[in-house]
A protein has these predicted regions:
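Conduit-forming functional cores of very large proteins
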Residues: 1-231
């Protein structure tokens, strides 16, 4: 869920057959200018624990001494097992590096492999960056690490939107600005909703708010579009 909203120019009309029912058409020019763009933050957290009496170690794994390494990119990790801030994150990057000693191999000089990889792989298909790293110890004395990532998200087909009144819909298509309808004054809408969505959802007050908003905008006045109250 991304709670992000703004005032938009809305056209209530059927257009191209791609905004049937609750489908919404968006103006690509408006999206390119930043409409409904949002920065999404996500936190990855990992807490160390003891395995067979040995505490896990946060570091960049050495492939010559570590078994079980993932088919992933370890190159962005620093010596603390995290990726430096403001670094681009890509799919299959190791976001948290961690190893644990292999107890039976620790004192055996004939064994080259001394550790087992416990690193975490990051999965993403969007442009994502490391925003903040935080490492500390919990009440039991174990180390924990938090990595906050940030992604700038632009609305795409299939995203769901709702008006303040609760009229919901999903993006059915995104048209270039030149393909959007235009008024005699040269005004193009940011979004187009289908008029059939209002009676089917029984959101008549949505239409009331829309008409009242247009009137008070032209008159420069304040209005009350509340649907319920004292009569």
């Amino acid at each position: 869920k991304i709670p992000s909203g703004t005032n938009v120019i809305v056209a209530i009309m059927t257009y191209s057959g791609l905004n049937q029912e609750d489908s919404i058409l968006f103006n690509k020019g408006s999206l390119d200018r930043g409409l409904f763009g949002a920065t999404v933050y996500h936190t990855e957290k990992d807490e160390d624990k003891k395995i067979h009496g040995d505490e896990e170690i946060r570091c960049k794994a050495d492939k010559t001494k570590t078994k079980g390494m993932k088919f992933a990119n370890y190159n962005k990790l620093n010596e603390h097992g995290v990726i430096p801030e403001n670094t681009l994150l890509e799919n299959n990057d190791i976001i948290l590096g961690k190893i644990v000693p292999i107890k039976e191999n620790r004192n055996d000089h004939t064994k080259i492999i001394k550790y087992k990889d416990m690193s975490r792989v990051y999965r993403t298909h969007e442009e994502c960056y490391v925003d903040k790293n935080y490492m500390n110890r919990n009440g039991e004395g174990y180390t924990f690490a938090k990595v906050r990532t940030r992604t700038y998200r632009v609305p795409t087909i299939g995203d769901k939107f709702s008006s303040r009144h609760g009229q919901k819909g999903t993006i059915g298509n995104i048209f270039s600005e030149s393909d959007m309808p235009v008024t005699g004054d040269g005004l193009r809408p940011d979004i187009i909703i289908n008029p059939h969505a209002i009676p089917s959802r029984m959101t008549i007050a949505q239409l009331k708010e829309t008409l009242l908003g247009k009137v008070i905008l032209d008159l420069g006045l304040f209005g009350d579009g509340t649907s319920f109250g004292a009569f």
